Amino acid sequence: MLDPNILRNELGAVAEKLARRGYTLDVDTLRKQEERRKVLQVETETLQAERNSRSKAIGAAKARGEDIDPLRQEVNQLGEKLDTAKAELEKLQAEIRDLALSIPNIPDDSVPVGKDENDNLEVSRWGEPGKYDFEIQDHVSLGELTNGLDFAAAVKLTGSRFVVMKGQIARLHRALAQFMLNLHTEQHGYLETYVPYLVNHETLYGTGQLPKFGEDLFHTKPLEEEAESHYALIPTAEVPITNLVRGDILDENELPLKMTAHTPCFRSEAGSYGRDTRGLIRMHQFDKVELVQIVHPDESMDALEALTGHAEKVLQLLNLPYRKVLLCTGDMGFSACKTYDLEVWLPAQNTYREISSCSNMWDFQARRMQARFRGKEDKKTQLLHTLNGSGLAVGRTLVAVMENYQQADGRIEIPEVLRPYMGGLEYIG
């Protein structure tokens, strides 16, 4: 959520910056709402002052033995007018808030201007794609050869975009998640957390999934139904972890907070019909190890570089070729002000595919959550800055390992760093 003060005082500049990401800010509506809000605010305060004055006059008149009925009638009339003005002001403020909640974050000035993924900027590459003297197979075929991936069984149980993993492939999937968690907690200083997989609406508003992206979620009840027990499955552990500081005021010396969690993630993929229908790339349910940092505003851009480096380290230790991409304004997520994507090399597709997205949200989520800290010198409260990234998507990492480590006979070599998690096993198949 953007700062209401800049929406009031710098509306033109905000509209120009949001236009870089392809968002058209409804300037006329915002201006009209703000003008009407000011009028109603003054009217409400004036009526309140008049009613208070008349109420005091009743006491004085009563002490003098005067007839107070006319004053009482006047106070009652002022009260009715005040109630009407307050109700209109509250309704307008709710409309202003609803509109504000639908406005995306302002891109950082360092973000390249562009329309879509074709305008993203490649920052660096690590590792060289392997050369194979045999016909490359994709992870689906390799999963069939090793009897480790069963999509037909998942269709029977649930439907498309699900999978049943078996045997050593299931074990490899588990090993990847354990390896990632150990790396981030033991070497990168993150606190491991276990969080609910169901969250309430307030939590989803806090990180920006609601109100705009409700159709991307799996809900326990129809979204239109208002209910206290209305939950949604988490689309990412970013949602519950970041909301751990919702409504809190931290001490500055508690910062930064660095947390990680391994969870399943659930997404409806509402806008992805026909895309990546084969294999594990785009699933309704997938596992991810999430990285979240809650930091001082002065540190957030440095924290983004560090967090992205933590995700990169996973790929480097697995010896998987990848590239780092700075997303353009038109390809960034709703809540982000700057995002790096890490894209891993998939031999069967002969291209790089996203395996991690690391973002600085600035104070956008913190304002929605009212998450603040108290300065150690001036004791004033400020909004925190929040960051998150995949460290990594476990299913896509499994795909990358299977395809990059495949052998001519269909076996899959286990990366050295994963062998301790696999009982010393060197090959699958």
Swiss-Prot record:
Catalytic activity annotation: tRNA(Ser) + L-serine + ATP = L-seryl-tRNA(Ser) + AMP + diphosphate + H(+); tRNA(Sec) + L-serine + ATP = L-seryl-tRNA(Sec) + AMP + diphosphate + H(+)
EC id: 6.1.1.11
Pfam families the UniProt entry points to: Seryl_tRNA_N, tRNA-synt_2b
Residues engaged in binding L-serine: T236, A237, E238, E290, S390
Gene Ontology CC, one term: cytoplasm
Role played: Catalyzes the attachment of serine to tRNA(Ser). Is also able to aminoacylate tRNA(Sec) with serine, to form the misacylated tRNA L-seryl-tRNA(Sec), which will be further converted into selenocysteinyl-tRNA(Sec).
Complex and partners: Homodimer. The tRNA molecule binds across the dimer.
The protein's name in its UniProt record: Serine--tRNA ligase
Species of the source: Photorhabdus laumondii subsp. laumondii (strain DSM 15139 / CIP 105565 / TT01) (Photorhabdus luminescens subsp. laumondii)
Gene name tied to this protein: serS
